[in-house]
């Protein structure tokens, strides 16, 4: 009842859903070249059957609040660009609790590939990481096909009024319900909300089946409990 009541209270705060989350983005002429991203002892190569996928999106104002001083965050956080939700990545999940990763070695992404997707995932190094760790485990996918797929899934998402939600008491379940209202076919149990230790919104993880359709998230995937409080950072820092 508590989650239902919270969702009902939030319904009045959800106007027509917004789509584009790169409010302002200009790709620079000089794009930093990423370094190789390879398997390590702590992050080993793991080839496993794919049971589904996770589409992870990051709340950029919160990211910039915590990580804006990092050298690799300048494009996203420290210039005239402005973002809402950005695309973290498309992650193959395993059939159980483990997932495939770093399935094969790969070279540095071409500049044109990075430039084409920098306004969705505003970090050349993160793009390199996502392809190396996750994309290489998707059979038959090239970097261009992998990013085209992840950007298509990201691009179809619609969003509630995050500014309005940030000004009212909010739970993870309430945010999930608001996100579901903005996206026909998406239910609250098809996503997970993550936050930092202070309760500031970090990411939303959307659960997909092997056909890239929304599905109920497995219980082991983690995220906040539906009644956990969530705060939304509005400013960059």
Language model features by range: what are they?
Residues 68-237:
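Domain-level detector of nuclease and nuclease-like folds
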Residues 1-7:
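Bacterial N-terminal signal peptides that target proteins for export
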Residues 15-17:
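N-terminal signal peptide c-region/cleavage motif recognized by signal peptidases
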């Amino acid at each position: 009842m508590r989650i239902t009541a919270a969702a009902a209270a939030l319904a009045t705060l959800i106007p027509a859903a917004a789509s584009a989350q790169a409010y302002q983005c200009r790709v620079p002429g000089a794009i930093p070249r990423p370094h190789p991203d390879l398997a390590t002892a702590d992050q080993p190569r793991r080839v496993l059957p794919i049971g589904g996928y996770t589409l992870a999106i990051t709340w950029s104002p919160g990211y910039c609040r915590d990580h804006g001083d990092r050298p690799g965050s300048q494009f996203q956080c420290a210039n005239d660009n402005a973002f809402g939700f950005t695309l973290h990545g498309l992650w193959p999940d395993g059939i159980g609790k483990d997932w495939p990763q770093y399935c094969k070695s790969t070279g540095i992404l071409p500049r044109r590939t990075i430039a084409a997707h920098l306004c969705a995932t505003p970090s050349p190094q993160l793009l390199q990481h996502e392809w190396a760790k996750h994309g290489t485990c998707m059979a038959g996918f090239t970097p261009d096909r992998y990013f085209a797929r992840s950007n298509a899934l990201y691009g179809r998402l619609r969003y509630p009024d995050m500014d309005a939600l940030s000004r009212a008491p909010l739970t993870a379940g309430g945010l999930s319900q608001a996100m579901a209202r903005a996206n026909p076919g998406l239910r609250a149990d098809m996503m997970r909300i993550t936050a930092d230790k202070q309760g500031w919104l970090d990411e939303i993880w959307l659960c997909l089946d092997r056909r890239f359709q929304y599905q109920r998230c497995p219980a082991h995937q983690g995220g906040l409990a539906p009644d956990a409080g969530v705060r939304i950072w509005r400013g960059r820092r």
